[in-house]
């Protein structure tokens, strides 16, 4: 399987279990935000309904414009803009196969130009550049990063909840498996 972001040897792994620190300046240009992590106080936008703070994807912080690669061969399921404050902004979902089963991968917080790089129904090769990472002005208001998430269930649109309520943890972890099954041991 291909890396979705080509990571350097050294990068930062965040611990957001005590929330984010707005004054912290990461000493590395590449960072990881963990899967299955409760992140108190980080999601105050309306779409999170005041109760969703369990992150069910992996975030890979990068410089703006960093190429995003498909982890495996697949077909573009959908693409579009999730434009609510705090959402993904430009988003691409690709249907892949893993161990003979269909699995959908969401690539979120992309650049606007990414939506011109692929089209719905397009065949994608393993490792193909499908997008680039967007900046805060288009990606929902977040520092530049790729939100990468898997789903065993076909999405009904061009979205998946990347953050769920703590009460939904068991259901969410079953539906949205740990992305390290395709990313490898990145932390």
Where are these regions (language model features)?
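Polar/charged, compositionally biased leader and regulatory segments
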Residues: 1-63, 169-187
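Acidic, glycine-rich catalytic/binding loops that coordinate metals and/or anionic ligands
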Residues: 1-5, 116-138, 142-187
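Short beta-strand micro-motifs in enzyme catalytic cores
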Residues: 58, 90-92, 144-146
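Short, conserved secondary-structure segments in the cores of folded domains
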Residues: 64-67, 114, 120
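Short, glycine/small-residue-enriched coil/turn segments at secondary-structure junctions
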Residues: 48-85
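Zn2+-dependent peptidoglycan hydrolase active-site motif and core
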Residues: 70-114
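Histidine-centered active-site/metal-ligand motif
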Residues: 55, 96, 109, 145-147
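Terminal peptide-recognition signature
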Residues: 60, 74, 94, 127, ...
């Amino acid at each position: 399987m291909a890396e979705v972001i080509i990571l350097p040897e050294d990068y930062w792994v965040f611990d957001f279990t005590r929330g984010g620190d707005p004054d912290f300046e990461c000493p590395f240009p590449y960072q990881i935000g963990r899967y299955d992590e409760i992140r108190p106080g980080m999601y105050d936008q309306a779409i999170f309904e005041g109760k969703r703070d369990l992150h069910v994807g992996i975030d890979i912080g990068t410089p703006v414009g960093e190429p995003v690669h498909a982890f495996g061969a697949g077909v573009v399921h959908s693409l579009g803009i999730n434009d609510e404050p705090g959402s993904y902004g430009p988003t691409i979902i690709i249907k892949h196969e893993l161990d003979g089963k269909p699995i959908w991968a969401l690539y979120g917080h992309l650049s606007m130009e990414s939506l011109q790089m692929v089209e719905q129904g397009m065949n994608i090769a393993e490792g193909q550049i499908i997008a680039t990472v967007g900046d805060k002005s288009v990606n929902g208001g977040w520092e530049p990063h790729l939100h990468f998430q898997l789903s065993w269930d076909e999405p009904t649109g061009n979205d998946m909840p990347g953050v769920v309520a703590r009460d939904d943890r068991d259901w969410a972890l079953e539906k949205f498996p740990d992305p390290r099954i395709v990313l490898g041991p990145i932390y």
